[in-house]
Amino acid sequence: MEQITGSIKQGGWDAVCILGPTASGKTRFAVELARTLSAQWKPCEILSADSRQVYRGMDIGTGKDLAEYGEVPVHLVDIVDAGTKYNIFEYQRDFSKAYTNILERGCFPIICGGSGLYIEAATRGYELYEVLPDEELRACLEPKPMEELVQMLKELKAAKGEKPHNSTDWDTKKRVIRAIEIEMAQGEQREPLPLPQKVLFIGVDVDRDTRNARIDARLQARLEEGMVDEVKRLLESGIPAENLIYYGLEYKFLTQYIIGELSYDQMVKGLGTAIHQFAKRQMTWFRGMERKGVEIHWVKR
């Protein structure tokens, strides 16, 4: 920890990102780091990069142990209602607001999470754009021949100094029109969102057998804590079963159990296997980040 804190204090970083698969202990590590830096350097606050902890009322199933943070402020947890669909574009917008607020108060941001897409949206220095369908533009473009649409798309990209890089943009008229729609909408966007440009990535990892054992023990503990009752309450509040199933993992399997699609034993076994596979996919994502040039400093916990 001393080597890490020294690097942070001397490195001129915009933020630190603590990432890792589920059950790796990354939250505990992030809190320890925040407390150490707050005592030695400047106040630190945590920005969650978890795609499901944003939802209110989804606590046990997402491992949202707010007590673990203690006195350390945490952002981007409990910000939208369960049953809604919060997307990556909204997350990047909300992250930027929270990140800017932390900096304005003279604090240091520590990003913590295991959702690779959210981590990249927050730290890779590019802004995502949610481009809604423009029916008026589509009606105008549809009668045009394919050759004219392709040329229009090439000119739009050239005006931004870009070269066509995705051959699938050109294979159907529908794809070309959608690509034009996106290019034109992006050209009208506001100034880029403030996002951290220089980020120190620290990965928290455990060996596979230990990780899987932790996952199984944690699953049993959460079931004993009332995870089934939590999902029942969400269903009783009026959230459709399919909306909870959409969230995957705990909420998918427990909902299927409650509505009679799975037995209890099938639910427990299937959920345990699914979480093991999920952790493996998380590690695959992080290795992919490394292949793209992101330097992740791995620590064992």
Task: Describe every region a protein language model picked out.
Residues M1-R301:
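Phosphate/pyrophosphate-binding catalytic cores of soluble transferases and nucleic-acid-acting enzymes
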